[in-house]
């Protein structure tokens, strides 16, 4: 799981907490990337952070849908 965020994004801060908890409970590795540190990430995802990527594919954005994320990580 990769969580795309940016500095001073309150929704991103909430997403970090949620993704950290969910991935921790499921023993799934995850990371955070700042969209503003990479031009291609900013161009593709910059208007809808936070964005959750699962196996490199966009899973969701703006908020963490816990049940849906859990299903993707356990199914």
Q: Where would I find each of the regions flagged by the language model?
A:
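Thiol-based oxidoreductase modules, predominantly thioredoxin-like and allied folds used
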Residues: 28-39
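Non-catalytic, surface beta->alpha helical segment in thiol-disulfide oxidoreductase systems
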Residues: 54-75
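Small/polar loops that bind or transfer phosphate-bearing groups
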Residues: 4, 33, 61
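Structural micro-motif
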Residues: 46-52
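Local sequence-structure signature of Cys/Sec-based thiol-disulfide redox active-site neighborhoods
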Residues: 1-22
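Short glycine-biased active-site loop of nucleotidyltransferases that positions the nucleotide triphosphate
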Residues: 42-44
């Amino acid at each position: 799981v990769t969580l795309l965020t940016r500095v001073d994004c309150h929704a991103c801060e909430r997403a970090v907490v949620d993704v950290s908890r969910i991935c921790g409970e499921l023993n799934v590795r995850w990371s955070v990337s700042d969209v503003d540190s990479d031009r291609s990430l900013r161009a593709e995802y910059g208007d809808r952070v936070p964005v959750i990527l699962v196996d490199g594919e966009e899973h969701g954005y703006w908020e963490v849908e816990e049940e849906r994320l859990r299903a993707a990580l356990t199914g």
